[in-house]
UniProtKB/Swiss-Prot annotation:
InterPro entries: Enolase-ppase_E1 (IPR023943), HAD-like_sf (IPR036412), HAD-SF_hydro_IA (IPR006439), HAD_sf (IPR023214). Pfam families: Hydrolase. GO terms for biological process: L-methionine salvage from methylthioadenosine. The keyword Metal-binding applies. Pathway: Amino-acid biosynthesis; L-methionine biosynthesis via salvage pathway; L-methionine from S-methyl-5-thio-alpha-D-ribose 1-phosphate: step 3/6; Amino-acid biosynthesis; L-methionine biosynthesis via salvage pathway; L-methionine from S-methyl-5-thio-alpha-D-ribose 1-phosphate: step 4/6. This is Enolase-phosphatase E1. It comes from the Bacteria. Keywords: Amino-acid biosynthesis, Hydrolase, Magnesium, Metal-binding, Methionine biosynthesis. Binds 1 Mg(2+) ion per subunit.
């Protein structure tokens, strides 16, 4: 019986275009100014710039060089933790100022509430930082959804296409793998979760449905129908 739902964000609860067409451009535009204004005064910014310098081989004192590296990583959609942390700081400013609103599909908003009210525990697992996850759900077009989630996971537990990452999550949650349903729009992530023993549902919101033995759903209402059968 499913007792825990672990969900991805991009393409699952939220539009991929929101991340790529809104969040990434916003970070790319505002990151240089943010770093120049805060690299001396905010320890959290300085700490992440040290990591960027170590990974890229750039001189820590070369602020313009570090900014260029970060812009390249944004363009490449790199999953570097330092980039995600800095993006999260920039997005936080945007959310608090009201310039940004997180996106949640109406069906996802509806069923996340229903599942929470039915006693299911809800968790997020995304390549975006935990801070960024909380911002998307805390300042969304559907209101504050952080009240419905019991916790958040990012790449600190490992990459989403690695089965060990899901074992790490299970260890933190202290639950049996068979009681967890993982929702994602990426087949490689589903495969990794299945290798760790989790149940899965493949969200395919647009385009043709794949020819697969995996459980496939168009939206969260179809996921709910599957839940009621289990």
């Amino acid at each position: 019986m499913i007792r825990v739902i672990l969900t991805d964000i991009e393409g699952t609860t939220s539009s991929i275009s929101f991340v790529h067409d809104v969040l990434f451009p916003y970070a790319s535009e505002h990151l240089p100014e943010f770093i120049r204004a805060n690299h001396h005064t905010l320890p959290a910014v300085a700490e992440q710039l040290v990591r960027v310098a170590e990974i890229s081989g750039t001189d820590r004192k070369d602020i313009d060089g570090l900014i260029n590296v970060l812009q390249e990583w944004i363009a490449e959609d790199r999953k570097e933790g330092a980039l995600k942390a800095l993006q999260g700081m920039v997005w936080e400013q945007g959310y608090h100022s009201g310039e940004l609103k997180g996106h949640i599909y109406p069906d996802a908003a509806d069923y996340l509430k229903r599942w929470h009210d039915r006693g299911l525990r809800l968790f997020v697992y995304s390549s975006g930082s935990v801070k960024a996850q909380k911002l998307i759900f805390g300042h969304s077009n559907e209101g504050d959804f952080t009240v419905f989630f019991s916790g958040y996971f990012d790449t600190a537990v490992g990459g989403k296409k690695e089965s060990q990452s899901y074992r790490n999550i299970l260890a933190e949650l202290g639950v049996d793998a068979g009681t967890v349903l993982f929702l994602s729009d990426v087949e490689e992530e589903l495969r990794a979760a299945e290798e760790a023993g989790l149940k899965t549902a493949w969200l395919v919101r647009e385009g043709e449905l794949p020819d697969t033995a995996r459980v496939v759903a168009r939206d969260f209402s179809e996921v709910d129908a599957l839940l009621r059968k289990r």
